[in-house]
From Swiss-Prot:
PANTHER family on file: ZINC PHOSPHODIESTERASE ELAC PROTEIN 1
Functional description taken from the UniProt entry: Zinc phosphodiesterase, which displays some tRNA 3'-processing endonuclease activity. Probably involved in tRNA maturation, by removing a 3'-trailer from precursor tRNA.
Organism: Thermoplasma volcanium (strain ATCC 51530 / DSM 4299 / JCM 9571 / NBRC 15438 / GSS1)
Keywords from the named record: Endonuclease, Hydrolase, Metal-binding, Nuclease, tRNA processing, Zinc
Note describing how the cofactor binds: Binds 2 Zn(2+) ions.
Cofactor entry: Zn(2+)
Protein family (similarity comment): Belongs to the RNase Z family.
Record-given protein name: Ribonuclease Z
SUPFAM superfamilies for the chain: Metallo-hydrolase/oxidoreductase
UniProt binding sites for Zn(2+) 1: H64, H66, H141, D209
Enzyme class name: hydrolase
Catalytic residues of the enzyme: D68 (proton acceptor)
Amino acid sequence: MASNIKIVFFGTGGSWPTPIRAMPGVGIQIDDVFNLFDCGEGTQKQIMKSKWSFMSIDNIFITHFHGDHFLGLIGLVQSMSFNNRTKDLNIFGPRGAIGIISNAINIGYYTLRFRINVYELEPDKTYDLGKFLLKTTLNDHPVPALSYTIEEKDIIRVDPQKAKELGIPSKIIEKIRDNGTYEYRGRKYSIDEISGGIRKGRKIVYTGDTKPMQKMADFAKHADVLIHDTTTDSSFEPAVNQFGHSSAKQAARIARDAGVSRLFLYHYSPRITDVSPLVDDARAEFQESYASEDLMEYEVKVKH
């Protein structure tokens, strides 16, 4: 069956927190698997304002180790311990993650009550994480930094007429789809016997901080959702590019070239209070551009 995929923007600002925006943190829930992308200062408090529980987080993916993207880990991990978490927590990041995260989670006096598994990921790799595939690429930022893609695995469509002709009930169809074959009433059925083609899995791309780069358009090709660094409007492009960031117009060009379904503007400069000029800039290049806001939720619908 198709998974339920939801995105929650816990924080959409960059550099430092403001009264209207929290630091970067994006939740992507795939059924009962909770993934957090970046964990800036105050992320746990933002999670408390949402429908999520910070105790349910399974995986945390850090794009890079500038403070606005990971300093929230310190408080989050300690709060998990105070609340008697026992299940493992997986934390992923670019080169240097093991040392930096080890230092962060060992600040201060507390008892760590659960196992933390830290993984350093290589760029341009694909990792099978069960419910989904995680893909990485090196982006253009002054420090080691990765962009991530979550890809739902392709799903085999079932032809109901074929299943009906074979006398296979719906509960058995799912077992055949999950296992490839399944024995029912003394006969082994194959998925090929009831297949109606392939439904491509949904794809979400989270860039983290990056200058615009053509490689990102290839990385985000035909994504359902692209969440791209849009630090400012086009009038400040030279300045933000110098520090490894993108403007809204540049992000929209990437979205257009990639052929994505929807672009979310993200990681606004703390000097920006009104994002409407950024949306206008972006929509001049790519109409399906939208401003993300703190605690906004978005459901990624199934492709038909």
